[in-house]
Amino acid sequence: MGRSGRHDATMTPPPPSNDLHDAFSADFEHELRFTRSVLDPSNPLLRDLVGWSDRGPRPGLIAVVDSGLHAANPGLPEAIERRFDDPGLPELRETIIVPGGETAKNDPAVVETVLSAIDTHRIDRRSLVAVFGGGAVIDAVGFAASTAHRGVRLVRFASTVLAQLDAAIGVKNGINRFGKKNFIGCFDVPVAVVCDEVMLETLSDRDWRSGFSEAVKIACLKDADYLDLIENNADRIRERDPDASRPVIRRCAELHLHHITRGGDPFERAEARPLDFGHWSAHRLESITDFAVTHGEAVSIGIALDTMYSHLVDRIERAEADRVIDVLKRLGLPVHHEALHGEAILAGIEEFREHLGGRLTITLLDGIGRPVDVHEIDPEVVTRAADLLS
Amino acid sequence: MGRSGRHDATMTPPPPSNDLHDAFSADFEHELRFTRSVLDPSNPLLRDLVGWSDRGPRPGLIAVVDSGLHAANPGLPEAIERRFDDPGLPELRETIIVPGGETAKNDPAVVETVLSAIDTHRIDRRSLVAVFGGGAVIDAVGFAASTAHRGVRLVRFASTVLAQLDAAIGVKNGINRFGKKNFIGCFDVPVAVVCDEVMLETLSDRDWRSGFSEAVKIACLKDADYLDLIENNADRIRERDPDASRPVIRRCAELHLHHITRGGDPFERAEARPLDFGHWSAHRLESITDFAVTHGEAVSIGIALDTMYSHLVDRIERAEADRVIDVLKRLGLPVHHEALHGEAILAGIEEFREHLGGRLTITLLDGIGRPVDVHEIDPEVVTRAADLLS
């Protein structure tokens, strides 16, 4: 029928269908790059990742910097400015410093500031937000970027061990509300995650060490060989030897990436969240202590608790459980906290269930690299596990 | 290697890779249901869509109702309460009335109210938000639901023609900020979209008619036969004959659904947005007139303008352009507004570009069902097109 063809006015309309069901899929790409001195003008990485190819107007860019990173690297804003002088890259329109650590996720002003800068500088869906910082700042800034214009392009420059091997790899973001961690957030895939080794050099010893608990977690869940690698390098990692730390950080990032891209549930719609091993108590511990315990430390304690619990319910052998706990200690991480003994910690079980919804699903260990999901936790056994760790 | 196997301490770590790239895809399902009297306890649809199967705790539900819908149907909250008394459905925990129309998207209190209710009533990712209303309320409530716990389940009950054939079908949501339409939002797929014909019966004549401009738009873009169907039924549609309107509404919803699920770009990452035909001026017209023009009316005017523009740049024949404009008029829709003649309307071109980013991309018509993307708009031709419509 031609484009001016007409049906007769008496035609029967197509029978109306009551049910329209359609399945579809969407494709995503996840780029993760390790480098040194990404802002050095001789480093080609940024041109490779976000180079401007002269098609359409030159895109804009705003940079958002974690105050903690800025304090340790006062020259960073100038280095960012110098790098984006390059006409082959997006045009830098503003550099904003935002509070680092959990404040970034607790203070709604951080998201507001970034949204307002996106508006003021006309950052559109082809333009960029570049965030430089730790996991909390990346989470909060990422939420702003993902919701402005339904998603402007985000490049995450992960500046902590925790961010480089875990937090910045994920495809989610979020902020805290109503006193609950990550109450608000969404799933989104960044344009790229850049892990610059130089940024780790100015971390405090405490922040350096805090990151490696997530590596132990991934080893417990995914790869017994990887626990060997951590174990064999633990003392040198604690002493911040970059050659010992580098392969541990990269392998963790890779395992995390593959969990998302090859695990079959990138946007966490299934019941289980295996990567949250040790996290029910960790989240709660952070909030009970008003974040005096870092996330990495809380995760270390949470791993120790759920590993010992796994032993007490006859899953993992004592020698293996002790091995996990020993690695954490050798990395300079805590495996116990007084708050584990009170009633308050147990509220973390229900909070954890509620965030995910449906049945409680907690990951335990049948062995190293052999996770198992359970749907009940016995508070008395939690207390006994805490006692064994004290 | 057994689970307590160890590598030798002198082993060579795996060579660190600088670049980790992984592609992945995610699967989605889109459910669209047409029915009558969905809240009648004898209607099995809700049990079919969101029935509770006794696995895990009974999920919760909050209902959010558009004030416009509530004003026209004061018994609605009670009907919702009665329906969800059914133990085979989620448990209703609160029904909230929120301002209808564009106020829902302009007033940040609407999103806040819904987030706060999600927190108070412990609505988790397995629980539900049910929104009853027009496109604007569905957009704002959807944004809250999509970002709480990174997405609680949402069922959209579309109560207007515009929502049933267009707004509620999309996989996005959003609110206005900084005086810009949809500045904040995200992509998300609802659990289901329910179109209840009974809800349309209490619409004002103006709101009834406003919905059909999107049907003409879809016909212009996708399906010349569908324009025949609208044309042949236009007079009866204007008079609100349900038998003439039903197939037009359902076919539009179906074309819209297939655009999303089969068009290859469900989350609009490509440059073109063909479904936004006529929308650059429509969005601007709404904002210039402070929403005195409804979205559907503005879209009708925008379609007429871009169709006439297409003729003036030698794309569509005059007779075909006139046919589109005539259908709009016969549906009782406006095709002209005084504000089309000023400078102010032209700012809509840049606003439209900015929201999408990159090059300007405007859809014109080479014929009915034959859209074409262009990257430039001549302001003088816009003015001549407006003159021809006045």
PLM regions with names:
Chain A
Residues 2-10:
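Short, Lys/Arg-enriched N-terminal segments with co-localized hydrophobic residues
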Residues 123-155:
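Active-site and donor-binding regions of nucleotide-sugar-utilizing enzymes
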Residues 232-343:
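Active-site segments that bind and position negatively charged phosphate/pyrophosphate groups
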Residues 12-127:
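ATP/NTP phosphate-donor binding region
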